[in-house]
Structure formats: C-alpha cells, structure tokens
C-alpha cells in the first residue's frame, strides 16, 4: 500500500517511522529541504519538496497511484486543500487531515464529503479526552478499555510504601485478592514482559490487565485511596487547555485555567464562562501558591514547552497534589518521567499518530486482522484486539500448550459478554475476542501471527 504524508513535522516524521516499520511504501512531502534531507538520511523514504496542496507537487509524488494521503502540514485550511486536491486527481484515494481549530470541529464533521475527507484528526481534542479519562479514574496513571469496556489495561507506579513493592508477580494476586495479569513492566525506561518470578521494585511502572470490577478491588486491597476529583488547575491556555477546560467544566469540577497572555485570557473567558481564567506565569512557584495549588486534587501542565511542564509538575508533586499530568510534545521527553518521578504523561502527537496508524491498518484489514490497537509504555508495547474466527489456529486448546512468539501474550479472552483474565488452562473458541499484548517491534497483521 502506498501512503503519501504531507508535512514532515513531528507527527509526519513519527508516522513515517511507524508506517515504514510495518512495510508500507511512504512518500514524504515538505517545502523545507533541510527537514527532508534529515528524514531521508534516517529513513528509507522517497521525499518530494514543494507545496503540499499544489497539484504539481502531488502529481510529482504520484498521488494518482497512492492509496492514502495524510495531511499533517501547517494550518487546517492548508491540510483541507491538500486533501481536496489529492481527491480531485485521484477520486479513489483515502484522505486524512489534521484539523485543530475548535471552531471547525462540528463543521468538518458535517461537511466531510464536501472536503473529500475519510477522517479528520485533532491531537489536542484527543489528548483532552485522554486526560479527562485519567482524571475520572484516580489511582491509575493510564487506563485503556477493551472488549466493549469490560476489560482494561491500566498503568500503576510502585511506590516505596506500596504493598506490591518487593513482591514477585506470581504472588501478586494473593495480595490484591483480585485476578489480574501483569503484561509489562517499565524499569529505568526499559520495558519488558516479565515472568512470574519477576520482583517488583520501587519506581517500577506496571501495566496490568483485568476486568473493571477486579481493578476496583485491586486498588482497595493494595491501599490506594481514591476520591473524586473536584478541583483541577490547568496550566496553559492553548488549544489543549481550552479543550480540556471545556470538557471538565461540563461536570461539577471546579476548573482553574492559568494562561500568561492577557489577550488569550480574555478570549478564553469569553468562550469558557464556567471556568476561572487567571492571567499569570504558571512556572512561578509563588504564583502557584497564591492560586491555591495545594488545595487542588489535580494539576495538568500543558504549556507550549516540555521543560516548563515538567517544572510545574514537580512543583505540584512537592505540594502533594494527588494527580499530576504532564503534556509533552517530544516523545523522547516522556521517558524522563522515570528519572523525575512524574505521574501521568500525555503526548498529543503520539495519540494522533496512533489513531492514524489504526486507520491505515484497518484499510488493509483481512480475516483475523486486529479490531483495535492501542500503544502504551511510550509506544514500546501494543495491545491488539482480535476476533477468533474459523481460520484461527489452536481453538479449544489450553494456552499452556501453545507456542507464542517471543514478547507476545494473550492478556484477556472475552467469551461473549464475559471477560476472562486467562491462565494456562484457559481456551478460546470461534466468536471470542482476544486481547494480545506484544512488543511494539512485533508486527501482528492477523491473529495467527502470534503463534510460532
């Protein structure tokens, strides 16, 4: 399959890396020669310099024979024109555009056919929804749902006083009094798929699969006290700050939004009547004290600068704020969380690229292909949802008898409406849904790819 990526920024480069790794043919368009040279030195990709929305440039990229065009260049209008032009040249092409302006949201949805769009993605809105999910379920750093919401993969940090500290994974269920499965552990930035003898240490981040009911019991039994978030401080009034404040203010949460630019504060106040908008420097510790940071249930740092967001998050942790969420734009910075001991880290660009990759995979979906794909642990691991069909191997055989690929495991089996966290005796049959966790380097196009 041939994919054209218009725009070689952070998202475009991230998509180039991911799609090339999966064997897709990629053509990259950008008007910056230096950026293109950097990409061609790093990746085996064809590069075309020029205006992404220009018919001449798109024809040079051979858009007539392309299956998909992804427009993640400059402004929204530019991306839309790029998609419309590509569709004009090749009516059969799929098109994806990044649209970030809040005012365009509903309009794009209603006029998708007019703009010749197969899908529109909004990194900031997607990140806002992800952060809202984290705030709704305190106690976890991250939470992804599968099997129509009946099973989940959550991220927890092992603290010094945790009941799980210095405990072998095989003994974990006796402590949590819940049936859970540890599918991955991140220690010092390195992610591994542990066995039962793996000893959990302070600072480890563990990724646990369980049903929603079992997770609730797990938190209670390991002594993690959770309470509903009532007061949130958002530091940064950009698009992401606006989307998050808008979402949270729909409920009964007291939202305080801090922004340094006065004109932007006025604009935010006009659009967010139920939000307390304050003009000030969120990187100033005394200012945060004056705004009552110590009284907040959660602090979300989402300024334009990763370094400032990390400083704000460290301030919040110093005041013992229960939930601290840090936005990063550079994915390599998300790994610093292990060093600094930060809480939840959200990367809008990573979420956006993952959503697009899921669409690309769905375009090529075949019998046994993944129904959904979620990346976690900084993209080093993936959780894939498969439906068992007549072509699936080893139906009815106990899991302990199967030979799976290295760094791949079956984390959940959903029998109709009944999810099961499997053990060696578990089996699956036609119609069941499997959640498979695998190393991000392991490409699983079909369910049968997990078997050796």
Regions found by a protein language model. Name each.
Residues 1-452:
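Cytosolic regulatory regions of ion transport systems
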């Amino acid at each position: 399959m041939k994919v054209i990526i218009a725009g070689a920024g952070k998202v475009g480069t991230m998509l180039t890396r991911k799609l090339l790794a999966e064997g897709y043919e990629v053509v990259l368009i950008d008007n910056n020669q230096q950026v293109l040279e950097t990409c061609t030195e790093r990746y085996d990709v064809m590069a075309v310099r020029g205006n992404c929305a220009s018919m001449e440039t798109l024809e040079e990229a051979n858009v007539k024979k392309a299956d998909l065009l992804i427009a993640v260049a400059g402004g929204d209008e530019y991306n839309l024109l790029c998609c419309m032009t590509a569709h004009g040249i090749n009516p059969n092409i799929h098109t994806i555009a990044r649209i970030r302006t809040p005012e365009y949201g509903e309009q794009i949805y209603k006029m998708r056919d007019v703009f010749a769009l197969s899908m529109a993605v909004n990194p900031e809105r997607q990140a806002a929804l992800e952060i809202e999910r984290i705030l709704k379920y305190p106690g976890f750093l991250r939470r992804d749902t599968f099997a129509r919401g009946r099973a989940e993969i959550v991220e927890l940090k092992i603290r010094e006083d945790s009941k799980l500290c210095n405990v072998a994974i095989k003994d974990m269920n006796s402590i949590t009094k819940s049936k859970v499965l540890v599918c991955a552990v991140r220690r010092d930035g390195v992610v591994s798929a542990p066995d039962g003898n793996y000893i959990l240490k302070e600072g480890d981040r563990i990724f646990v699969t369980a049903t929603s009911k079992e997770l609730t019991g797990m938190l209670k039994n390991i002594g993690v006290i959770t309470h509903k978030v009532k007061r949130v401080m958002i530091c940064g009034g950009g698009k992401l700050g606006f989307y998050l404040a808008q979402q949270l203010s729909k409920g009964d949460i007291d939202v305080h939004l801090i922004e340094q630019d006065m004109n932007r504060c006025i604009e935010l106040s006009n659009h967010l009547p139920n939000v307390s908008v304050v003009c000030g420097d969120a990187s100033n510790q005394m200012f945060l004290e004056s705004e009552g940071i110590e009284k907040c249930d959660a602090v979300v740092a989402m300024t334009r600068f990763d370094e400032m967001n990390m400083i704000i998050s460290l301030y919040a942790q110093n005041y013992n704020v229960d939930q601290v969420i840090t936005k990063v734009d550079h994915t390599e910075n998300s790994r610093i969380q292990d060093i600094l001991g930060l809480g939840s880290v959200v990367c809008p660009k990573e979420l956006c690229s993952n959503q697009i990759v899921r669409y690309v995979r769905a375009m090529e979906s075949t019998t046994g292909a993944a129904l959904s794909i979620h990346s976690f642990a900084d993209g080093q691991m993936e959780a894939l949802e498969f439906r068992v069909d007549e072509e699936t191997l080893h139906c009815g055989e106990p899991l302990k008898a199967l030979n799976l690929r290295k760094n791949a495991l079956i984390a959940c089996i959903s029998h109709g409406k009944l999810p099961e966290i499997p053990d060696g005796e578990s089996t699956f049959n036609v119609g069941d849904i499997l959640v498979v966790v695998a190393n991000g380097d392991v490409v699983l196009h079909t369910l049968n790819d997990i078997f050796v």
